[in-house]
Amino acid sequence: ARGYYEEFGKPMLEQEFPELLPFIATGFVGSGSERFGFDDAISRDHDFEPGFCIFLPGEDVVDRKTAFRLERAYAKLPREYMGFTRSMISPVGGSRNGVIRTAEFFQRAVGQPDGNLTVQQWLEIPDYALAEAVTEKYLRMPMVSSPPFVKDSWTCPRTLC
């Protein structure tokens, strides 16, 4: 992820979307054994591929049209890197890489877009979902931090933390 981002993603963002740099983060998070560092030269699984995530804030900061332009630019990045091929990005989802709204990512992962959960909600989140939400390798953090990029912005009920 880091090599692919440094070679292709970072230049694309800096050249085509410099105005977004203060607001977006890039990283390698979510589901999949490679997110946890388990895929290596011997044990790569069926969906091992080069790529990274571009996290966007809400539409009040990055509108739909700009997000769409960013999705198209990501889709145009090279399909092969170091002998590995990227999966096709479907407009209806399916890829774990690409442009993702932070609120949508955390809604899928833990059930709340902002991380404000009751004690009961925290206890009901499956372990794998929590792991996917917090096991991150951020390649670039936004200059203007907003939840959920700042870990302590998540409200963990005092009875649990």
Residue ranges and their predicted role:
Residues A1-P11:
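N-terminal regions immediately upstream of nucleotidyltransferase
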Residues P57-K65:
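Short coil/turn segments at secondary-structure boundaries
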Residues M12-C53, E59:
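Active-site nucleotide-donor binding segment shared across nucleotidyl transfer reactions
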Residues R64, F68-C161:
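Conserved NTP/Mg2+-binding pocket subregion across the NTase superfamily
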